Amino acid sequence: MLCALAVAVAFASSPGRAATPEPGTATAADEGFARDMAVHHQQAVEMSFLARDNTADEEVRTLAFDVINTQANQRGMMLGWLDTWQAPKISVDGAMAWMEGHGGGMAPTDMPGMATREQVDRLKNTKGADAEVLYLQLMIPHHQGGVAMAEAAVKQARNPQVKALAEGIVRAQQSEIDLMTSMLGRRGATPTPASPGPAPSAPAPSAHH
């Protein structure tokens, strides 16, 4: 199942590699999604390296390896888009300013599904079966947050490569959520509640870059 999922994820990310967006073709939503999702992916990669190193379970290690490869590749692609668009990699308005229903101004750690530094440190210091369960319990809400961000980008983004990547992220990460929930169940554990995230505020401006 993991191999099939990896193929699906690779296919989902291929539209972004097939064509490079041209300078000046990005809206605030295109840029904001690429910027924030790159940060979101960075934490998923970090936690997956910790899980890979802290457990000998092949199923969890294979999942972690797939997350590392897929999300590191997508992160590099999104940072490359920002370079092409001559857009900053850090927003002066804070994270999530592009997403309707959020006013921005928040720290990257406040993005949907992001683990706290304390949770990441706990994963770093946890080994074996406990590390497997903790990794899955952190990654499920992390993926749920990523899906919410990608669904917003599907609606708000205007660049076709950005929309294609966002659509692929929704499909792939939802599949991984289902897989990780099943993996937790086989380990006698359940997902932890997803963070509700910050309260909505005024819609983000729709000005173009």
Annotate each predicted stretch with a short phrase.
Residues 2-209:
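All-alpha RGS (Regulator of G-protein Signaling) helical domain and cognate RGS-like helical scaffolds
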